Amino acid sequence: MNNPEIVMIGLGYIGLPTAALIASNSVYVHGVDINQNVVETINQGKVHIVEPELDYAVANAVKEGYLKASGTPVEASTYIIVVPTPFKAKNEPDISYVEAATRGLLQLFKAGDLYIIESTSPVGTTEKMMSLIYRERPELKDKLHIAYCPERVLPGNVMYELVHNDRVIGGVNEASTQKAIAFYQKYIKGILHPTNARTAEMCKLVENSSRDVQIAFANELSLICDKAGIDVWELITLANKHPRVQILQPGCGVGGHCIAVDPYFIVSDFPMESKIIGAAREINNYKSFWCVEKIENAKLQFEILHKRKPKTAIMGLAFKPNIDDLRESPAKYIAQKILQNAQNEVHFIVEPNIKSHNFFKLTDTQTAIEQADIIVFLVAHDEFKNIQLSDDTIVLDFCGILK
């Protein structure tokens, strides 16, 4: 491999597709990940995550010599940080991975380089990293281009949306913004909207917080309708006939490493000003707990009626349909709670998008449907649609797949 132009720190659900996209444009990309299995898998031209078209893109980029993975960074002209930003105690954001990745680049930076953070981050993170860099490398002050550019892609359609979605790009100064725009223009067909780093950071958080609030309204409706004896799916369909109403669909909660996480970045920093955002998080978290209660009640009623414990099928573990991503998944939380509460019961856990799991013993769809007394739909995977159910099977549909 020739000297790389791009170093991509983090080869997960966003970093690897981004690296593959850039490499597909005949640009040498050096990907970095702390997981040696990930590194070895990629260098074999294979992928460790499920994402349509990604396997072909990676295989081709590796074969052509434009993509290589490693455990350590090397010198380049552009560095992109796409690492996790998890929580500390009390839902406080943890930017230690971003800081560690940045520290790993300190001795590689040179004047004129471009440093970009794509990781979802609290407001002010880019400025903190700039201060860190200049404190350790004062001779580079005002000689690096530093920017924040959040991804805004949908799992399951990442390879398309990376290219075609608009992006918000915010530099620590105008020169950094323009440098970052010039970089992304080579690979992205969507409109690139310039701003400053703080606004770009908040923009990503607000986008996902807005979705969380809207989903919370739908989930709250589902709780109300359950108590009122109303079909929430029919209600929402009818309400959406109004030309200025567009209610989202309820589910068993909210998951993923964006919508279920990003609101806390705002609530943590602005607790007094983010009442609606905080309340939405509470509602969506409660919906998962409510689903557990409904399942446990259905199992109890079955046992009272039939004098035996039911066999229960839990359909879906991913945080959204047709992907293998279980991060922050309410379905996974519900399945774990059901198993923890179980005593001498049979459960069929079905997740067609993963081969195995270190906690759950997985079952195929057909076996679960044929043997279960109670079927719980948590995720609307395509594989679950048009399933023929027995008339005497008890069905709990928390994702609207039967509507």
Language-model region placement:
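Structural/interface elements that position substrates and couple domains in central-metabolism enzymes
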Residues: 1-403
